[in-house]
Amino acid sequence: MVVKFTKSEALHKEALEHIVGGVNSPSRSFKAVGGGAPIAMERGKGAYFWDVDGNKYIDYLAAYGPIITGHAHPHITKAITTAAENGVLYGTPTALEVKFAKMLKEAMPALDKVRFVNSGTEAVMTTIRVARAYTGRTKIMKFAGCYHGHSDLVLVAAGSGPSTLGTPDSAGVPQSIAQEVITVPFNNVETLKEALDKWGHEVAAILVEPIVGNFGIVEPKPGFLEKVNELVHEAGALVIYDEVITAFRFMYGGAQDLLGVTPDLTALGKVIGGGLPIGAYGGKKEIMEQVAPLGPAYQAGTMAGNPASMASGIACLEVLQQEGLYEKLDELGAMLEKGILEQAAKHNIDITLNRLKGALTVYFTTNTIEDYDAAQDTDGEMFGNFFKLMLQEGVNLAPSKYEAWFLTTEHTKEDIEYTIEAVGRAFAALADNK
């Protein structure tokens, strides 16, 4: 099968004349998979995409995670339509934002108080500000390879040592800002302890993806998150969970419910918007009371809590409350994992597959992936070839070796069976070109 992308290629050529790099987020380009024009989608329904050339795909991108209920879910679409008919932006309080805040609190008991913002980046950025206001300290800690949005303070790399002050990961981020960030490897208690022994008295908070989603799906080792809480609290700092990817993705109550570990502050996004722009943050009452108008930590937003996003988020959570959906995602995920591993063995392709319920990552390596260094040391060229072969098979993945495959509640066993067959054909082609 040879799929043509003529219209996507023409559209990308035109986009390059008007939009920086031809895309509105760099992760949408095909730079990480060998280049070429990214595929422009025209519509989505359920588990499927159709591009501007009319090609149909089974979608495992899910907009990098938010689309857990599938594209154009009727309950969510109706809620958005009703909100639009009533006016999408007021600049005033609404009943919808109160209802949605109550739903989030009921789902995640660690949220005594909630504030809505417009993106995951904004949610994380503000939790850092609140933690600094509460503790009176300035430094933060993060784990290498964990992405927490594109604000200056979190765009840092690990530096040259195992536990270092940060170095900028983007042009335009001053070294002085990066020096406020301490980066340590994920799943390594000893290095975390060493860093806290050295800098703990200056640390306001540690940012934690409780289940990593940004160098693939990587779970914490048993007891790791509990030890993080213990060591960080001993240092007088706060624990911030970045659940922008994980909240409502693996379990209704988020990773903190699934893993049984409670943070001081939580940042949310992606799934909670039902596909519309959103972010939220919340936590313990005494910490959240640092936020204006109650406290000195200022945060505001013209679009924050807009009725359309609130309505979409409420509708999404109502869908996810239906019995058996998370069990279905886990069942389909297990089926997909088993099939991919069988195809890899059949065609002698070396892979490591990390899966948690309805999300997984295929790494082209034989190594165990438990931290960022291991994820980096995988075959990006082979992934790029695999990605393009899967496009030809009508299977849409994220164009990066670090990203996850996300299942939706609309995927079927037939979709999984076809995907496994497509993986087999792609692996056969890779084996022929070794």
From Swiss-Prot:
<dbReference type="GO" id="GO:0030170">
    <property type="term" value="F:pyridoxal phosphate binding"/>
</dbReference>
<dbReference type="GO" id="GO:0042286">
    <property type="term" value="F:glutamate-1-semialdehyde 2,1-aminomutase activity"/>
</dbReference>
<keyword id="KW-0413">Isomerase</keyword>
<dbReference type="GO" id="GO:0008483">
    <property type="term" value="F:transaminase activity"/>
</dbReference>
<keyword id="KW-0627">Porphyrin biosynthesis</keyword>
<comment type="subunit">
    <text>Homodimer.</text>
</comment>
<dbReference type="InterPro" id="IPR004639">
    <property type="entry name" value="4pyrrol_synth_GluAld_NH2Trfase"/>
</dbReference>
<dbReference type="InterPro" id="IPR015422">
    <property type="entry name" value="PyrdxlP-dep_Trfase_small"/>
</dbReference>
<keyword id="KW-0963">Cytoplasm</keyword>
<protein>
    <recommendedName>
        <fullName>Glutamate-1-semialdehyde 2,1-aminomutase 1</fullName>
        <ecNumber>5.4.3.8</ecNumber>
    </recommendedName>
</protein>
<comment type="similarity">
    <text>Belongs to the class-III pyridoxal-phosphate-dependent aminotransferase family. HemL subfamily.</text>
</comment>
<feature type="modified residue" description="N6-(pyridoxal phosphate)lysine">
    <location>
        <position position="270"/>
    </location>
</feature>
<comment type="pathway">
    <text>Porphyrin-containing compound metabolism; protoporphyrin-IX biosynthesis; 5-aminolevulinate from L-glutamyl-tRNA(Glu): step 2/2.</text>
</comment>
<dbReference type="InterPro" id="IPR005814">
    <property type="entry name" value="Aminotrans_3"/>
</dbReference>
<dbReference type="InterPro" id="IPR015421">
    <property type="entry name" value="PyrdxlP-dep_Trfase_major"/>
</dbReference>
<dbReference type="GO" id="GO:0005737">
    <property type="term" value="C:cytoplasm"/>
</dbReference>
<dbReference type="Pfam" id="PF00202">
    <property type="entry name" value="Aminotran_3"/>
</dbReference>
<keyword id="KW-0663">Pyridoxal phosphate</keyword>
<dbReference type="InterPro" id="IPR015424">
    <property type="entry name" value="PyrdxlP-dep_Trfase"/>
</dbReference>
<dbReference type="GO" id="GO:0006782">
    <property type="term" value="P:protoporphyrinogen IX biosynthetic process"/>
</dbReference>
<dbReference type="InterPro" id="IPR049704">
    <property type="entry name" value="Aminotrans_3_PPA_site"/>
</dbReference>
